[in-house]
Swiss-Prot record:
Putative adapter protein involved in asymmetrical cell division and cell polarization processes. May play a role in the formation of epithelial tight junctions. This is Partitioning defective 3 homolog B. Residues 356-374 have a biased composition (Low complexity). Residues 838-865, 881-921 have a biased composition (Basic and acidic residues). Highly expressed in kidney, lung and skeletal muscle. Expressed at intermediate levels in brain, heart, placenta, liver and pancreas. Isoform 1 is predominant, while isoform 2 and isoform 3 are expressed at lower levels. It comes from Homo sapiens.
Length: 1205
């Protein structure tokens, strides 16, 4: 085998044959090879103090290599080297100084070993110079110039006194360091500590109120160990306070501030200490001059490695291969910064007469998990006899991956739940197998070992020799905790658990345990749960937690036993009684709060109250109420006692214990309060908690419940009621749960919802579409599809409610509304009412102004043009009519979805096309029976029948339309203006409905000149217009416009609708309802397409109209069809009905009735009329507004009358 010994950066490969050499012999061979490699002069020498593993473990020179290292392993040589000696000086002037090799070996060699860099030589680099690395590397009896004469003799290192002061002097500096690492020694009380520190440093006392010091500091890194020892003054500003008062000089180091040692504090921590100190009136600083820097660095290292060696005499045990008397160990030369390693290693080598070490045996060195495992020195050998039964030996093995140098050591991997191993209880996972049935397995492969074990027959006994390192299954010993190393019943809870065992494949409880041993006294402090194995019995039970101390198992107390005995007792009890009962009873001690290392309290652990809250909460989450009762005794005072849990679990894991599978942090938090035994005041006193308790009764107001995002964003709708209650009880802001009310809207994003909630600060509130973008889609969607809420919005304009309560959003929120708080909703509605009312008032004013301007323009315009425009607009709602519609909508409070007009227009076009296609078919079928039907319905129908009978009817209509279409539209448009005013003015138009309907049906459109005048008259609501309309009708018949009757009827229906619309105002509720329905239809149908007019035209017979008007008005059919089938179905129906109504077939009249109900929303009808015209001629149809003008100008184009047909 071969071993590589590293001298700094130089590696020396030493062949070791079969590994039978001792470590001391390896050291000598490595040294010889290294000297050859260096090729230095005769005065150059190197001394190796010891060899270490790469992780810091020290090898015993007496060990055999095969037992402690593997082939091709790397070892680190802790050595010192010296250039040829020259002039010898002793600046200290101490008569004890000697230049003999003995003195050199005893003092200097030991000291150099402590600070010699890994590279084997001191490298002076620019960075080192900036950090103030001194170039004088030899002092005292070293044959080189020493430090300046101002160095005090006690600080130098003459024989006899140098080490006496060097070793202890660092103890003061390392006081906090030792606390951090749990290294408690009597050096802390050594009187020489302060003396030594004062010898090397100077004290500077400054006032914290004098302003900034004007110094530039960087971390003070030790050139020997690389540790941070304080703050290095890199520069001083000119004209600064430090410069003026001469407080500091460049290259000095601040190592202590107000009795706070800066050793091993990070730069940020040191700066913070400095800042805090400057806030006090007086600041006491210990400043290290550049010349004493190395001495200070060495002393810091020395104290870590020679505990209590302060008698001035080097009475230390030196490794055999090195004959010097140095007990100092090179600190962290291997690149490891673990003071614990240094401490344990030095303890192994040194025996201090001044510091009695209780527990006589030194702690085992820290080794890598596998390297050196099972050696004579590092582990104890245990012989275990396992009787092979029907279930086998009951364990599995694993080997280290060592493909480079052959098979590695073989370890026990798992103990199976059944078999000889679990019954015996002694074999553990991680044990290294050395022998099987007397045969050495070192160097054998895993397959060979398995074959050897399987060769044991059932009933025979397999004899195993295993090596077990205590440190392998017991935790790294906690750093010194002399006064608080064990949990006490007074400061912790005693819990009893009955945990059922399972057959999940894991042995026993499924927990990994750790123990603690006091470094100072060496006594065992008990065993604790280090971790819970996933899938094991404890994991499934969910009540055990990390760092619980086991004090009894199945009624057998573990207190007073050593850690090893307690482990054996636990293992035996679980394997025997536990397996028999299927249940394990555990009594544990659980500390109420999880501590955190506090370097200021002598290694004591303390943690904010939050940790206590967290643990208590977790406890209540994981345990039954009966088990939680002991928590009731926990008080905030108990939390602040800073209990120390004597296991390294606290130091190892800074994060809270992982939640059990039964309660994930974000899911089961509401269960915290369910434990009756735990008073919320115990763990919710005054700290801010990052958990949210869903039970409001347990929530003090002082707690800021910043619920986790996972909880906020994914609330459970089933808890909305309780959350609503909580909102009223707790003043805290819980915006997460309120989102549950908005879950019904799939288009909204959680973020927008959260943003909205924050804005409104109302727990259950319907989002305003204009406030939150995420809900805009829903609003527009509703607006486009459901017109049923347009009417109610009219009421909103009066200040009765908000848009969101009636429009499409109302439907979205219908789910959440019942869940919400009615009071909150009322408040919200009121607030929104005020805003809405103001907005709508402004809109109304604007709308009124626009309407007035329009009226003025219209008055100035040619009456014929005005009528045409209105007629076209009424039918298609294009161009100017759009604005009219907007103004009217504003007046009525229905102007909500103006932005959707384009979409509606597109839909309207599609529906027109469909209606047109169907219209053509119906025309042909119904034309035949139209005469008979019309004759039966109206006396004047014979004229219409003639037109319909005529195959050129549609064309004739077009020819006639130019005039009649204008009339038709004229009459409807003025009535519209009038009716709109009427309904609001309350003028009664209902009595004239019958006459008007009949007249409109046939007379409405034929007369252009008369219609405008008539239109003005109908506005007034007089009977004169009816007479004129009749005259127009007869005149049209005479002129040979048979279709005019139909067209008139159809147009009249639209006009009639307009008139009827005004009538609803006077009618009262019924009319209002009708009007609302008509309005809705009006808003929807016109956009959807004007199909109703056609229906009305055929059904136009005056008698029919009159009869239908009354029933239809009461009927809600018109309203319903527009709502439900608003876009297409209604139009289709209308189309079908229109044709039947126009034509004699009986089914048509049946449809007529419902359609006429729809007819009231005449505006839609007009629109549909153009659709019909378009149907007749798809080309012109596209531009409905254009069609009308064309009709007027060119008789060949389709007329509105044709569309009506």
């Amino acid at each position: 085998m071969k071993v590589t010994v590293c001298f700094g950066r130089t590696g020396i490969v030493v062949p070791c044959k079969e590994g039978q050499l001792r470590v001391g012999e390896l050291t000598q061979q490595a040294l010889q090879r290294y000297l050859k490699t260096r090729e230095k002069g005769p005065g150059y020498w190197v001394k190796i103090h010891h060899l270490e593993y790469t992780d810091g473990g020290i090898l015993d020179p007496d060990d055999v290599l095969a037992d402690v290292v593997e082939d091709k392993d790397k070892l680190i040589a802790v050595f010192e080297e010296q250039e040829p000696l020259h002039k010898i000086e002793s600046p200290s002037g101490n008569p004890a100084d000697r230049q003999s090799p003995d003195a050199f070996e005893t003092e200097v060699a030991a000291q150099l070993a402590a600070f010699k860099p890994i590279g084997g030589e001191i490298e002076v680099t620019p960075s080192a110079l900036k950090l103030g690395t001194p170039l004088l590397v030899r002092r005292s009896s070293d044959p080189v110039p020493g430090p300046p004469a101002d160095t005090q003799p006690s600080a130098s290192h003459p024989g006899g006194q140098s080490l006496k002061l060097v070793v202890p002097d660092s103890t003061q500096n390392l006081e906090d360091r030792e606390v951090l690492n749990g290294v408690q020694t009597e050096l802390l009380t050594s009187p020489r500590t302060k003396d030594t520190l004062s010898d090397m440093t100077r004290t500077v006392e400054i006032s914290g109120e004098g302003g900034p010091l004007g110094i530039h500091v960087v971390p003070f890194f030790s050139s020997l160990s690389g540790r941070i020892l304080g703050l290095f003054i890199r520069g001083i500003e000119d004209n600064s306070r430090s410069k003026r008062e001469g407080l500091f000089h460049e290259n000095e180091c601040i190592v202590k501030i107000n009795n706070v040692d800066l050793v091993d504090k990070t730069f940020a921590q040191a700066q913070d200490v400095f800042r805090q100190a400057m806030k006090s009136p007086s600041v006491l600083l210990h400043v290290l001059p550049p010349q004493n820097r190395e001495q200070y660095e060495k002393s810091v290292i020395g104290s870590l490695n020679i505990f209590g060696n302060n008698d001035g005499v080097l009475k230390t045990k030196v490794p055999p291969p090195v004959h010097g008397k140095s007990g100092l160990k090179t600190a962290n030369l291997t690149g490891t910064d673990s003071p614990e390693t240094d401490a344990s290693a030095s303890l192994q080598q040194n025996k201090s007469p001044r510091v009695p070490r209780l527990g006589g045996k030194p702690s085992s060195p820290s080794l890598s998990p596998l390297m050196g495992f099972g050696s004579n020195k590092n582990a104890k050998k245990i012989k275990i006899d396992l009787k092979k039964g029907p279930e086998g030996l009951g364990f599995t093995v694993v080997t280290r991956d060592s493909s480079i140098h052959g098979p590695g050591p073989i370890f026990v991997k798992n103990i199976l739940p059944k078999g000889a191993a679990i019954k015996d209880g002694r074999l553990q996972s991680g044990d290294r197998i050395l022998e099987v049935n007397g045969r050495d397995v070192t160097g054998r492969t895993q397959e060979e070992l398995v074959a050897m074990l399987r060769s044991t027959k059932q009933g025979e006994t397999a004899s195993l020799v295993i090596a077990r390192q205590e440190g392998h299954f017991l935790p790294r010993e906690l750093k010194g905790e002399p006064d608080c190393c064990a949990l006490s019943l007074e400061t912790s809870e005693q819990l009893t658990f009955e945990i059922p065992l399972n057959d999940s494949g894991s042995a026993g409880l499924g927990v990994s345990l750790k123990g603690n041993k006091s470094r100072e006294t060496g006594t065992d402090l008990g065993i604790f749960i280090k971790s819970i194995i996933h899938g094991g019995a404890a994991f499934k039970d969910g009540r055990l937690r990390m760092n619980d101390q086991l004090i009894a198992v199945n009624g057998e107390s573990l207190l007073g036993k050593s850690n090893h005995e307690a482990m054996e007792t636990l293992r035996r009890s679980m394997s025997m009684e536990g397996n028999i009962r299927g249940m394990i009873q555990l009594v544990i001690l659980r500390r109420p709060e999880r501590p955190m290392e506090d370097p200021a309290e002598c290694g004591a652990f303390s943690k904010p109250c939050f940790e206590n809250c967290q643990n208590a909460v977790t406890t209540s989450r994981r345990n039954d109420n009966s088990i939680l009762h002991p928590l009731g005794t926990c008080s905030p005072q108990d939390k602040q006692k800073g209990l120390l849990l004597p296991n390294d679990g606290w130091a190892e894991s800074e994060v809270p214990p992982s939640p059990t599978p039964h309660s994930a942090l974000g899911l089961g938090l509401e269960d915290y309060s369910h434990s009756s035994g735990v008073d919320s005041a115990v763990y919710f006193p005054d700290q801010h908690i990052n958990f949210r308790s869903v039970t409001p009764a347990r929530q003090p107001e002082s707690i800021n419940l910043k619920a986790s995002k996972s909880m906020d964003l994914v609330p459970d709708e089933s808890k909305v009621h309780s959350l609503a209650g909580q909102k009223s009880e707790s003043p805290s802001k819980d915006f997460g749960p309120t989102l549950g009310l908005k879950k019904s809207s799939s288009l909204e994003s959680l973020q927008t919802a959260v943003a909205e909630v924050r804005k409104n600060d109302l727990p259950f509130h319907r989002p305003r579409p204009h406030m939150v973008r995420g809900r805009g889609c829903n609003e527009s969607f509703r607006a486009a599809i459901d017109k049923s809420y347009d009417g109610p919005e009219e009421i909103e304009a009066d200040g009765l409610s908000d848009k969101s309560s009636h429009s499409g959003q109302g439907a979205l929120n219908c789910e959440s509304a019942p869940q919400g708080n009615s009071e909150l909703e009322d408040m919200e509605n009121k607030a929104r009412k005020v805003k809405k009312t103001k907005e709508k008032e402004k809109k109304k004013e604007k709308g009124k102004l626009k309407v007035k301007e329009k009226k003025r323009k219209e008055e100035n315009e040619d009456p014929e043009r005005k009528i045409k425009k209105k007629g076209f607009g009424a039918m298609l709602r294009f161009g100017k009519k759009k604005e009219d519609k907007g103004g009217k909508a504003e007046q009525k409070g229905t102007l909500k979805h103006g932005g959707l007009r384009e979409e509606e227009l597109e839909k309207m076009k599609e529906e027109r096309e469909r209606i047109g296609a169907k219209h053509q078919e119906l025309r042909e079928k119904q034309a035949r029976g139209l005469l008979d039907y019309a004759t039966g319905a109206i006396g004047s129908v014979y004229d219409m029948d003639d037109d319909e009978m005529d195959p050129n009817y549609a064309r004739v209509n077009h020819f006639r339309e130019p005039c009649t279409s204008a009339n038709v539209f004229r009459s409807p448009s003025p009535p519209r203006a009038g009716p709109f005013g009427y309904p609001r003015d309350g003028h009664p138009l209902s009595p004239e409905r019958d006459h008007l309907e009949g007249l409109y049906a046939k007379v409405n459109k034929p007369y252009h000149p008369l219609v405008p005048a008539d239109s003005g008259r109908p506005t007034g609501g007089s009977t004169d217009r009816i007479q004129k309309l009749r005259k127009e009708y007869y005149q049209a018949r005479r002129e040979g416009f048979p279709l005019y009757e139909d067209d008139e009827g159809r147009a009249r229906p639209s006009e009639y609708d307009l008139l009827w619309v005004p009538g609803r105002g006077p009618d009262g509720n019924a009319h209002n309802l009708r009007f609302e329905g008509m309005e809705r239809q009006y808003a929807s149908l016109p956009r959807g397409g004007p199909a109703d007019p056609v229906d009305y035209l055929p059904a136009a017979p005056r008698g029919l109209y009159k009869e239908r008007e009354l029933p239809y008005y009461p009927g809600a059919h018109p309203m319903h069809p527009p709502k439900g089938s608003y876009p297409r179905p209604t139009e289709l129906r209308v189309a079908d009905l229109r044709y039947p109504q126009h034509y004699p077939p009986p089914p048509a009249p049946q449809h007529k009735g419902p359609f006429r109900q729809d007819v009231p929303p005449s505006p839609p009808q007009h629109q549909r009329m153009p659709a019909y015209q378009e149907t007749g001629r798809p080309g012109p149809r596209g531009g409905s507004p254009d069609q009308y003008p064309y009709r007027t100008q060119d008789s060949r184009q389709k007329n509105p009358m044709t569309a009506a047909v």
